[in-house]
C-alpha cells in the first residue's frame, strides 16, 4: 500500500495539495525580503504612489488567494472536490462536461414528457368513462321524461276529441236559431212560439264551460310542447352520437311544417254530414209551412229565395279550402297529434341508442371475461409445468446425495 492510501487521501486531494504547494513556493520566491519592505515603508508617499504594481503580480496574487480559499473550503467540507477540478481543467474538459449535462437534461426532460403524456392518457380515459356514464344517465332521464310527456299529450288528445265532438253538436242550435231569425219576418206566431220552445232547451253555460276548458287544454298542450323542446335540447345535445342526433334534430324541425300540412289537408267529415242534416230539416219545415200557409204565396217566395242563398253559401263553404272548416280546437288537436308523433320518434331514437350502448358494454365484458379465462388457464399451465420440472429435478438431487 502507498502512503496516500494509508493516510486515506484520494488522488484529487493529493493533486490539490501539490498544486497548493507549488503556488505557495512561487509566492515565497516573488515576495521581497524584509529589508526591501522596510525601505519601502521609509520612502515618501509620493514615490510609493508613483510605482504601480505589476499586472502579473496582481493576477498571481488573486489566483493564489482563490486557490487557498478553495482548499480551505474542501477541508471544511463546504464545497465538493469537483469544483476545483472544473476550475483547473482546460476548456475542452469544460465543454465535454457541458455536453454531458445537456444529455442528462434532455433525458430528464424526455422522462418528464413521457410521464406527463401517460398521465394525460389516464386522465383522458377517466374523462371518457365519466362522460359515458353521465351521457347514459342523461339519456335515461330524458327517456323517462319523454314517456311522461307522451302520456300527458295522449290525455290531452282524448280531451280535445271530446271538445271537438261537442263543438260539432252545438253549432246545430246556432244555425237553426240564425235561420229562424232570418225567416222570422214571414212566419206567424206559431213558428215564433216553436222557436222559443227550442231555445229554452239550449244551455249557454255548457258552451262557456267548453270554451274555458278548450283554452286550458290549448295552454297545456303548447306548454308541454315547449317543455319537450327544452328537455330534448338540454339532455340530448352532447349525449347522443351523430346519426341519432341528426334524426332528433330533423324530427324537431319538421313539427311546424307537418302541423301546417295536416291542418290544410284535413277535412272533417262530420261537418258535411251536419250540413246535409240541416238541409233536410229545412226542407221538412218548408213543406210544413207550405201546407199551413198556402194563402201567403209572397212570403213563401221570399223564404225560397233566402233558402237558395243559404244553400249557395253552404255549397261555397263546402267547396272552400278544408282549413276553413277546422276550428281552433281542431287545430290544437292536430298539433297535439303531431307533437305526440314527434315525441314517439325521439323516444325511439333514444331507446335504440341506449340499447346499442348496452349491447356494446356486454360485448366488452364478454371479451374481458374471455381474456381473463385465457390468462388464468395460461397461469395454471405454467404452474403445472413448473411443478413437473421441480418433481423431475428433485429425484436427481437425491440420487446424487445417495451416491456421495
From Swiss-Prot:
Residues 378-387 have a biased composition (Low complexity). InterPro entries: TF_Opi1_Ccg-8. GO terms for cellular component: endoplasmic reticulum; nuclear envelope; nuclear membrane; nuclear periphery; nucleoplasm; nucleus. GO terms for molecular function: DNA binding; phosphatidic acid binding; transcription corepressor activity. Residues 186-201 have a biased composition (Acidic residues). Keywords: DNA-binding, Endoplasmic reticulum, Lipid biosynthesis, Lipid metabolism, Nucleus, Phospholipid biosynthesis, Phospholipid metabolism, Phosphoprotein, Repressor, Transcription, Transcription regulation. The modification Phosphoserine is found at residue 10. One of its GO terms (biological process) is negative regulation of phospholipid biosynthetic process. Residues 139-160 are annotated as: Leucine-zipper. The keyword Lipid metabolism applies. It is found in: Endoplasmic reticulum; Nucleus. Pfam families: Opi1. Residues 109-138 are annotated as: Basic motif. Its main location: endoplasmic reticulum. Residues 26-37, 394-404 have a biased composition (Polar residues). Transmembrane segments: none annotated. Residues 25-51, 170-201, 305-327, 378-404 are annotated as: Disordered. A motif (FFAT) lies at residues 200-206. It comes from the Eukaryota. PANTHER family: TRANSCRIPTIONAL REPRESSOR OPI1. Negative regulator of the transcriptional complex INO2-INO4 in response to phospholipid precursor availability. When precursors become limiting, OPI1 is retained at the endoplasmic reticulum (ER) and INO2-INO4 activates INO1 and other genes required for phospholipid biosynthesis, whereas abundant precursor availability results in targeting of OPI1 to the nucleus to repress transcription of these genes. The FFAT motif is required for interaction with SCS2 and proper localization of the protein. Interacts with SCS2. Present with 1281 molecules/cell in log phase SD medium. This is Transcriptional repressor OPI1. The lineage of its organism: Eukaryota, Fungi, Dikarya, Ascomycota, Saccharomycotina.
Amino acid at each position: 500500500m502507498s502512503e496516500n492510501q494509508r493516510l486515506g487521501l484520494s488522488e484529487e486531494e493529493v493533486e490539490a495539495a501539490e498544486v497548493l504547494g507549488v503556488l505557495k513556493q512561487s509566492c515565497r520566491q516573488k515576495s521581497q525580503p524584509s529589508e526591501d519592505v522596510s525601505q519601502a515603508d521609509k520612502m515618501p508617499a509620493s514615490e510609493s504612489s508613483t510605482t504601480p504594481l505589476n499586472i502579473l503580480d496582481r493576477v498571481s496574487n488573486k489566483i493564489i488567494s482563490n486557490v487557498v480559499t478553495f482548499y480551505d473550503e474542501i477541508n471544511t467540507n463546504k464545497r465538493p472536490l469537483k469544483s476545483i477540478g472544473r476550475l483547473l481543467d482546460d476548456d475542452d474538459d469544460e465543454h465535454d462536461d457541458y455536453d454531458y449535462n445537456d444529455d442528462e437534461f434532455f433525458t430528464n426532460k424526455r422522462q418528464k414528457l413521457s410521464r406527463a403524456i401517460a398521465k394525460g392518457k389516464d386522465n383522458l380515459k377517466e374523462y371518457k368513462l365519466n362522460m359515458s356514464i353521465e351521457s347514459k344517465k342523461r339519456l335515461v332521464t330524458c327517456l323517462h321524461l319523454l314517456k311522461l310527456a307522451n302520456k300527458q299529450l295522449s290525455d290531452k288528445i282524448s280531451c280535445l276529441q271530446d271538445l271537438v265532438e261537442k263543438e260539432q253538436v252545438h253549432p246545430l242550435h246556432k244555425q237553426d236559431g240564425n235561420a229562424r231569425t232570418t225567416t222570422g219576418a214571414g212566419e206567424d206566431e206559431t213558428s215564433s212560439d216553436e222557436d222559443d220552445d227550442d231555445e229554452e232547451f239550449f244551455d249557454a253555460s255548457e258552451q262557456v264551460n267548453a270554451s274555458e276548458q278548450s283554452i286550458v287544454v290549448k295552454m297545456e298542450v303548447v306548454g308541454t310542447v315547449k317543455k319537450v323542446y327544452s328537455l330534448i335540447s338540454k339532455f340530448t345535445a352532447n349525449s347522443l352520437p351523430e346519426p341519432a342526433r341528426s334524426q332528433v334534430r330533423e324530427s324537431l324541425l319538421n313539427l311546424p311544417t307537418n302541423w301546417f300540412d295536416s291542418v290544410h289537408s284535413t277535412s272533417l267529415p262530420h261537418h258535411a254530414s251536419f250540413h246535409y242534416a240541416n238541409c233536410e230539416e229545412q226542407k221538412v219545415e218548408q213543406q210544413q209551412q207550405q201546407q199551413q200557409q198556402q194563402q201567403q204565396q209572397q212570403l213563401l217566395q221570399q223564404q225560397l229565395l233566402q233558402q237558395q242563398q243559404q244553400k249557395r253559401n253552404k255549397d261555397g263553404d263546402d267547396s272552400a279550402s278544408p282549413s276553413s272548416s277546422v276550428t281552433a280546437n281542431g287545430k290544437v288537436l292536430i298539433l297535439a297529434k303531431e307533437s305526440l308523433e314527434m315525441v314517439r320518434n325521439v323516444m325511439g331514437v333514444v331507446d335504440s341508442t341506449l340499447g346499442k350502448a348496452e349491447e356494446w358494454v356486454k360485448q366488452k365484458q364478454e371479451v374481458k371475461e374471455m381474456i381473463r379465462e385465457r390468462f388464468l388457464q395460461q397461469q395454471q399451465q405454467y404452474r403445472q409445468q413448473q411443478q413437473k420440472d421441480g418433481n423431475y429435478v428433485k429425484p436427481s438431487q437425491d440420487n446424487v446425495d445417495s451416491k456421495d
